[in-house]
Amino acid sequence: MTKIKLLALGVLIATSASAAHADGKFTLGAGVGVVEHPYKQYDADVYPVPVISYESENFWFHGLGGGYYLWNDTNDKLSITAYWSPMYFKPGDSDSEQMRRLDKRKSTVMAGLSYVHTPYGFLRTTIAGDTLDNSNGINWDLAWLYRYTNGNLTLTPGIGVEWNSDNQNEYYYGVSRHESRRSGMRSYDPDSSWNPYLELSANYRFLGDWSVYGVARYTRLSDEITDSPMVDKSWSGLISTGITYTF
């Protein structure tokens, strides 16, 4: 597995860790994940998924992201956060000759603020910006989720929306004039976008501290993304399942 593909597991790891996290402070596990890319002639990728989660009064860590709490009580949690964004484009991974002539888009580290409010279900929002001078973009995620528990089974459906700044979209989905001349694709300069999504996590606890989990997310891509000549899908998605142990 290449380094860049391993980094693409970040969102799966973070989601899986959150789904598997129970009453304990430290969770370890392993599973498998499938990522569906929106890029033209990109196949779905199947990866092994390590799950790591830690929670304390001052710090938290889930997958490839973590944070420091500025405020942490029963109903409200505000934290400074940083995480590795798994978005990337590797020209050689596409079967399209035109796509193979485009520039590489790199993954990056995003940093910002995260807030969770939990009286009725829970509201989750994060705003973060690129720190490595790759896209110089900003991403804002807002979601509402409701946790339903029946015995050892916990289901958490959610609905949300993701906003990408124009810099973010231009870096990952835009085609420069230089790339257009080299590849034969039309040039494209997208604006900012709103991308709604649905997600579902399931966790079943057995034998005390052991659990099996499943997580999935479906994102409907906006016209600013689907109009890109780099894209041939109207959606992106991920799914993961595995087993964990909570200490």
Model-found features: residue ranges?
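Cleavable N-terminal export/targeting peptides
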Residues: 1-25, 41, 207
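Short glycine/proline- and aromatic-enriched beta-strand/turn motifs that initiate or cap beta-hairpins
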Residues: 21-69, 77, 167
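Repeated loop/turn-to-beta-strand initiation elements of outer-membrane beta-barrel proteins
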Residues: 26, 58-61, 78, 121-125, ...
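Transmembrane beta-barrel strands of outer-membrane/channel proteins
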Residues: 28-34, 63-65, 80-86, 125-129, ...
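Extracytoplasmic loops and strand-loop junctions of Gram-negative outer membrane beta-barrel proteins
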Residues: 32-35, 94-98, 126-127, 180-186, ...
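Transmembrane beta-barrel architecture of outer-membrane proteins
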Residues: 47-49, 63, 106-110, 137-141, ...
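Outer-membrane beta-barrel "beta-signal"
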Residues: 49-53, 234-247
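Outer-membrane beta-barrel transmembrane domain signature
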Residues: 67-70, 131-133, 137-211, 215-225, ...
